[in-house]
Amino acid sequence: MLVLFGNFYVKQYSQKNGKPENGATPENGAKPQPCENGTVEKRENDTANVRPTRPAGPPPATYYDSLAVSGQGKERLFTTDEVRRHILPTDGWLTCHEGVYDVTDFLAKHPGGGVITLGLGRDCTILIESYHPAGRPDKVMEKYRIGTLQDPKTFYAWGESDFYPELKRRALARLKEAGQARRGGLGVKALLVLTLFFVSWYMWVAHKSFLWAAVWGFAGSHVGLSIQHDGNHGAFSRNTLVNRLAGWGMDLIGASSTVWEYQHVIGHHQYTNLVSDTLFSLPENDPDVFSSYPLMRMHPDTAWQPHHRFQHLFAFPLFALMTISKVLTSDFAVCLSMKKGSIDCSSRLVPLEGQLLFWGAKLANFLLQIVLPCYLHGTAMGLALFSVAHLVSGEYLAICFIINHISESCEFMNTSFQTAARRTEMLQAAHQAAEAKKVKPTPPPNDWAVTQVQCCVNWRSGGVLANHLSGGLNHQIEHHLFPSISHANYPTIAPVVKEVCEEYGLPYKNYVTFWDAVCGMVQHLRLMGAPPVPTNGDKKS
């Protein structure tokens, strides 16, 4: 059932014909030029990319106070395109809310490790807010602030509700009461998974066993779910080096951890189930809803094609190709183009170390997963073993990731605010029940944390076994609200998240069983595959 997802708005900022206020000039007085496809070749001769000098003295008293720059007495204004050009670690800028920050000298000091390089050249408001549940590091950030963004536009609303701040406070308090650290707690599980992974690899390669190839697929999926996923979110350990090593688990499977980080951390987590229109110079798109398009239609704002009416039938065979496609094709396309959809991947893939990691891991996996089995057992048998291993891994991973967002219980959004967002009778009933218990003002529907609750669905919430078998993805709501918290802690904070959601009138959606969640996904695919119903304004042919 389709209903209008109303009451959305976007905060527009006046640009006054593109000129800064109070007579201030753009950086170096240069007219900003658009960045073409994220290329960096123009930087050497681009006068608009000379790094401004930071003012001396202590940081401002408050987060939004102005900095005195070059004696002008006002902050400099920068455009989004100017920020985009500073995307490499040797010259890296980022934005948070309306502030522009030159973090080049801070990258090596960042307590969270190298994850900050993912945000270079782009808006990091969501990353900074969601990865610092104990509070935004304003004092540190102000040391690197160089100006204000002249043209900030975003779908999301910030600071208009206490929902997310209160949720953070109460979730962290619950962890403290339970004596659980925010990160870590996965060492024993990781050891068991890696042991099974390497033993099963040896068995299927050395003894041409299809059974062990399937076991490797299961173990490999858990390297992805339980090790690299937490590692690349900075949640596997309190040690940043250990997190980085855990994040390379994706490379261990045969896919690229770098490409995955851009798609998952930068794309999916920031813009969950969101499709952008032309309002934004940097589109706010969730790449996951386009991951199988046009073969499959997952978002109501993507165009329908006749073969989509059968997508609920061929979805599961297609899901099984997830890791094979990443190992053999899609990762290479991203590395060569430096783009994942609308996401510029230059900050990690241009530097030499990024190239060495990508190509080195790909070569090693090609030799160990394809060449060696083919050499030992013949080409046909070697490729068959490789296929079985990755079909099992791909199916397991795809289902675990997809059923939490592509579901009849999830919202699907568009930055134009005119799309019809899908709500089922179950979701409406849950919303009405939550409204009856509401004790606090309902946040605006485009509050970022609210959209995460609306676009995610849990299954078997609170279940410890389900939590470990899914790498915490059965607690999808908790994961999206607190990506830097270890999935081992999700059963602990889930009751708090549910309680706060109900207090603010937000439906906390949870399927009782895994099978219910799978059925919710299939039902959504059926609805997205049905031919669109003509409206009154449509002309009859």
Swiss-Prot record:
Q: Which UniProt keywords apply?
A: Electron transport, Fatty acid biosynthesis, Fatty acid metabolism, Heme, Iron, Lipid biosynthesis, Lipid metabolism, Membrane, Metal-binding, Oxidoreductase, Transmembrane, Transmembrane helix, Transport
Q: Which residues bind heme?
A: 110, 132
Any one Gene Ontology molecular-function term assigned to this protein's record: heme binding
Please provide, in alphabetical order, the Gene Ontology terms of the cellular component aspect for this entry.
membrane
The GO annotation for biological process reads: long-chain fatty acid biosynthetic process; unsaturated fatty acid biosynthetic process
Q: Which Pfam families match?
A: Cyt-b5 (PF00173), FA_desaturase (PF00487)
Its annotated compartments are: Membrane
Motif Histidine box-3 mapped to chain: 476-480
- Where on the tree of life does the source sit, at the highest rank? Eukaryota
Span(s) of short sequence motif Histidine box-2: 264-269
Using the UniProt record, give the first listed, main subcellular location. membrane
* Membrane topology field: Multi-pass membrane protein
EC numbers listed for it are: 1.14.19.31
Q: Which SUPFAM superfamilies match?
A: Cytochrome b5-like heme/steroid binding domain
Cofactor(s) annotated in UniProt: Fe(2+)
What sections of the protein cross the membrane?
A: 186-206, 209-229, 314-334, 356-376, 383-403
- Map out region (Disordered) in residue numbers: 15-60
Where is the motif Histidine box-1 annotated in this sequence? Answer: 229-233
Q: Of which family is this protein a member? A: Belongs to the fatty acid desaturase type 1 family.
The Swiss-Prot or TrEMBL note on domains reads: The cytochrome b5 heme-binding domain acts as the direct electron donor to the active site of the desaturase, and does not require an external cytochrome.
Q: What does this protein do?
A: Fatty acid desaturase that introduces a cis double bond at the 4-position in 22-carbon polyunsaturated fatty acids that contain a Delta(7) double bond, resulting in the production of delta-4 desaturated fatty acid docosahexanoic acid (DHA). Also acts on the 16-carbon polyunsaturated fatty acids.
The protein depicted here goes by the name: Acyl-lipid (7-3)-desaturase
* Native source organism of the sequence: Euglena gracilis
